[in-house]
């Protein structure tokens, strides 16, 4: 591991995904709002939780000991689930954590390869956790870089060409059975985000005879009227009246048999329906992977863009460290300057000099002295941060000199020992 890569070790992730625990089990790992708030009280770290139908991923940043905070979360999960659920987590830190999130943002790790939806999900996640006060500037730059990498991958590769989103795949698989939707009776069960997207796509496909069913009739009505469709109260016994039904509704682990001739496209997690003539998310995943095999040559390009993104993240991180360092030092210098100017004003007043112009000259002169005196030092510090082999150790050592506290969990002992050793050998 290079010294630069060590800088990223303050970032870690705890992962539960459709690849590791299966799409049908993923709902067991979702965090409730109360559990998220409990984490805030438990750990000493910035954190954000990315929860989608494909994954539950916790990202952390701590400037002390991130792995210690990871272990706290895993123990917490074990306690609330009354079983060692944390043992099923995949834990990544440093460059590996960044690479994973960047691949997720690129759509290369999605159930539906190349999907665009994940970018908005990453954006809404970091925005929400920032608003809640659970994430800070270091996790912000981590997620912002992931979003930039995701956009760049889509611009420079063909990973997202064609219909790759999970909703598009669901529509296409249903169309294969009927050629088109023009004269088909279609049912959408649910009125949430997924159902809204399915309904919008059906409208774009020219579907005319569509009915929205939902437990809350008002939500079904609101969605249906938006597209000029019908709506009804949820009644599963009526499924046999339709040619195709798209299912997107929350349920408490129900499993129902498809006893009708209706084609059921069930994108619920876990699936509500089993049996013949049922298409689930797992089936759509298989189709997505087959589609991606035709674009496997894009993987090398994607991996290169991800590696470039990690180097850019390192730059972002160092820039944030430098900005924080400069802010701390300049705040201290400015406090000293202002105090000394006040002393000088008082001395001038003792001499009978109470000229406002003289005070302004004194203010400008001290600012100029500080700028000319410290600029070479600041230039050297910037060079150490962005180019130095032991950049983070030098930063902490300089801050120790100014007695202003550390901004990183990396110890300064190594650099101090090195300096002592060098003096001893003279």
UniProtKB/Swiss-Prot annotation:
CDD domains: NAD_bind_Glutamyl_tRNA_reduct (cd05213). GO terms for biological process: protoporphyrinogen IX biosynthetic process from glutamate. SUPFAM superfamilies: Glutamyl tRNA-reductase catalytic, N-terminal domain, Glutamyl tRNA-reductase dimerization domain, NAD(P)-binding Rossmann-fold domains. It is an enzyme of class 1 (oxidoreductase). The active site is at 53 (nucleophile). Keywords: NADP, Oxidoreductase, Porphyrin biosynthesis. Substrate binds at residues 52-55, 110, 115-117, 121. It catalyses: (S)-4-amino-5-oxopentanoate + tRNA(Glu) + NADP(+) = L-glutamyl-tRNA(Glu) + NADPH + H(+). Pathway: Porphyrin-containing compound metabolism; protoporphyrin-IX biosynthesis; 5-aminolevulinate from L-glutamyl-tRNA(Glu): step 1/2. Belongs to the glutamyl-tRNA reductase family. This is Glutamyl-tRNA reductase. The gene is hemA.
